[in-house]
Amino acid sequence: GFALGRHGADWTVVASVFGGNANTGVGSEGVAATARATYAPIREDDRVLHLGLAGSFRDLPRDGQGLSLSSRSEAFLYQRNFVDTGDIRDASGVRRIGLEAAYRDGAFLVQAEYIHTEVERFGGARTVGFQGGYVQASVILNCKGRAYKIAPDYGATYAVFSGVQVAEADRVSRGGIGVFEFGTRFSAIDLDDAGIRGGIERDVRAVDVSAAGDWSEVKVWYGPTGGLGTSS
C-alpha cells in the first residue's frame, strides 16, 4: 500500500490505499482506502484547538471467513472480550467515519473521538451499523503540556499530540522525581444492531501516571449485561 500527505500551517490531509499480502494476492484480504483531514483554528505555543474528520472503506472478499468486531477492557486487565459480534460471514465491505476534537491549554488536554461503522453484506442483507467513542481529559502536574505536531518527521502520522517531554533534571535516573499526569476517561461501544448482539460496553477510569512508570488506576465498567464492576 501507499499513503500520501500534505499540510499547511494549520491543516493536514492524508490519503492511503492498502491491500493484502503480495504473496497471496493484493485482493486476498480486501482492498482498503482511507483518508483524514484536520484543521487547527487555534494553534499557539500553549493553546491548541484541533478538529478532524476521517473515513475509510474496505472491500471484503467472498471467501467465507467473514468479519468480526470486538473489544476488550481498555486497561487490558482481563483477557476476554467484553463485547464481540462473532463472525459476520456474509460481510462484503466495511465503511467507517470518524470525528475527532481536542483542546489543549497549557498542561491541560481534553480530547474526544466518535466512530460509526457500517458493515455491508452479500445477497441484499440489511447493512448493520455499530458505533463507539470516548472523551478523556488529563493534566500534567509538574511539566509543560504535550506538543502539537502538524507534520511527522517521517511516515504519514499528521496532526497529533506528542508524548510528555521529561527534562533531564526531572528523570528518576538523574535523581529527579519524574513527571506526574492525572487523567480520566469515559468510553462506550455499541455492537448491537439488526439481530447481531455483540453487546454494549461503557468504561470510566481515572489514572495517575508518573514518568518513572508507576501508575494507579480506579476503573468502573458497565458490561453488556448491565453489570457494574470496579478494579484498582
Regions found by a protein language model. Name each.
Residues 1-62:
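Aromatic- and glycine-enriched pocket-lining scaffold segments that form the walls
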